[in-house]
Amino acid sequence: IDYAMAHGVNYYDTAWPYHRGVSESVVGKALQQYPRESFYLADKMPTYLLPTREQAREIFEKQLEKCKVEYFDYYLLHAIRFVEDYQTVYEKNGVLDYLLEQKKQGRIRNLGWSFYGNTETLEYLLSRDVQWDFAMVQLNYHDMLHEYKIAPHQARFIPKDPAPTQWMFEKMQQSGLPLIVMEPLLGGRLARLNKKALAVLQTERPQASAASWAFRYV
């Protein structure tokens, strides 16, 4: 993180389960030496735990404590896959109302969601009467041109019929909702192209890395 800060990176993303539950604490410790206004911090409500409102409150308070901050710049409903999950956790359990209250109090600056679902789920999310500030979706040049490819570490999370990337991107453009991109390197695979594929790119920009092409795309 020190290297990243020194080279202009100012957006940091963490979550409750990352690195076996220690990511938030590590990120908080690393960032505490820097002025709070010098970086943007994103964290997430663990949808997969199906938390109640009270459990969500406990999780949120613990996240602030672990990250050593008084507010999150970006806060996400983590990994929305199915309509039923969203309805159970965020509507029936009252977790969305709780998070909206935290936003009113200034403890969440921007509220959004990360998406791993099918077309039905995306259309449902966009139809809700909620003033979302942003959404996070998987976007890279491979998925825009070919069938959606699941990164290995995501396999157990993704529905069998994920929304096609091109369709999803067009749907998000129509909604006007700002996007944050995840998986620009497709789990690192677009940074490790075979020699034949890399040679095609190098005919245009010989010194550019495979990773730089992927980042330029998004």
Q: Where would I find each of the regions flagged by the language model?
A:
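Short, acidic/polar
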Residues: 1-4, 52-68, 117-126, 210-215
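N-terminal binding-site loop/beta-alpha segment at the start of enzyme catalytic domains
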Residues: 1-39, 70, 98, 104
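Conserved, mostly hydrophobic/aromatic
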Residues: 4, 12, 27, 41, ...
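A structural motif
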Residues: 9, 69-72, 108, 132
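Aromatic/hydrophobic pocket-lining residues that form the small-molecule binding cavity
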Residues: 23, 56, 60, 92-95, ...
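A short, structured active-site edge motif that brings together acidic residues
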Residues: 37-49, 71, 75-78, 138
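Active-site groove signature of glycoside hydrolases
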Residues: 64-87
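Beta/alpha (TIM)-barrel catalytic core signal, keyed to glycine-rich beta->alpha loops juxtaposed to Asp/Glu
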Residues: 80-218
